[in-house]
Amino acid sequence: MTDNLVIYHLHSDNSLLDSCTGYKLYIDRAAELGQPAIAFSEHGKPLNWVKKKMYCDEKGIKYIHGVEIYLTESLNEKVRDNYHTVLIARNEQGVKELNLAVSKSCDKDHFYYVNRLSFDEFLKLSNNIITTSACLASPLNKLPVDHPMYESLVKRYDFLEIQSHDCQEQRDFNVHLAELAKKYSKPLIAGTDTHSLDKYKAECRKILLKYKNKSYGDEDTYDLTYKSREELDAAFARQGVLPPELYRQAMDNTLVMADMVEPFELDASIKYPILYGSSEEDSRIETERVDRMFKEKLEAGIIPPEQEKGFRSALTEERRVFEKLGMSGFMLCMSELICWCKENNIPIGPGRGSVGGSRTAFVTDIIECNPEQWHTVFSRFCNEDRKEIGD
């Protein structure tokens, strides 16, 4: 079964406590409907995007990287205008640019209740970012049409987003967007502003909003559940303000937008630091460091003579594993960092987690607990078959 629709304006429980639906439930539903792609537009930040992409890949659905960003007229004035706009990465470079823009929006001079970009910063985004005008909190709805930035904003949007909510403000905005689309030759696109998987999850969200003491005006008249093409078509028909050929073309344009997005591969491999130019050089320096500090601890009696043999055997094996996994630079980095902290009177803890099984970590002052004394196990921290980074 194939459903000719892509849901791209979508909020999971990552969206500032504004949803009770986990991202996997949405992706499962998209796969069930046969929808070819899905995008998440979480409020302000593309949280958990790596996990979302990996799960989309697992389900055979195209992942589209997006966010619903907050815009402000000026960063100089502390005003909670917080206009909404959806950003979608067109390609891998767009993913990096989108993430960088979100990071910038979190800077101290940008943040005011929420992370924000200025209108000027938004307009300077490259064509690697696809933009839609978002919901009723869009600047195209909240600003007067004679605002000096209004026309520039309209021209920057790649798509003007109509939605099917059955309230007068949305009806009026849809008509206005259709007029703007005609005037500026901009395509309409059908957004859903999905916040819940189904009616049950929508009720859960109502309870959550009550708990937060939040109310969003006419939202009781909205249906923010996940839609199939047939369901969204029926919702626009009930709304009754746009001709069918217009809103159906807007639904088709969700597929057009998805086709504009280039798929990209995610390198989820573990990446350890290289401190001195190459893994081989890091390994050589780490070996010298371990040998020197081991000798110092033996001479100081920190490592008792009866433990020397066990330590030597363990250090040799750990060195082999670290070199095979490319971890020498990581261990060297941690040792140098912690020793520097101690030399500069910066408090650190005695160590935690499975690293307590590493004799190398003890010898190089990463931890203070002697693994040989307490018979802790190195393989719990690191072994050739472990896929995750040890803690």
Question: Can you say where each PLM-predicted feature lies in the sequence?
Answer:
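Class I SAM-dependent methyltransferase SAM-binding "motif I" and its flanking Rossmann-like core
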Residues: A361-I389
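Hydrophobic or amphipathic alpha-helical targeting/insertion segments
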Residues: K45-F111
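A structural-propensity feature for long, helix-poor, extended segments
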Residues: L232, F236, G240, C382-D391
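Conserved, well-ordered active-site substructure
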Residues: E203-Y216, I367-E368
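Domain-core and long-helix interface of multi-subunit machines
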Residues: M1-F40, G44-K59, L100-K199, E245-Y247, ...
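Non-catalytic structural connector segments
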Residues: M1-V6, L242-S354, F362-I367
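Histidine/acidic-residue-rich catalytic or RNA/ligand-binding cores of hydrolases
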Residues: R171-N174, D198-L209, A361-F362
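Enzymes and membrane/adaptor proteins characterized by extended Gly/Ser/Thr/Asp/Glu-rich
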Residues: K210-Y211, D218-L242
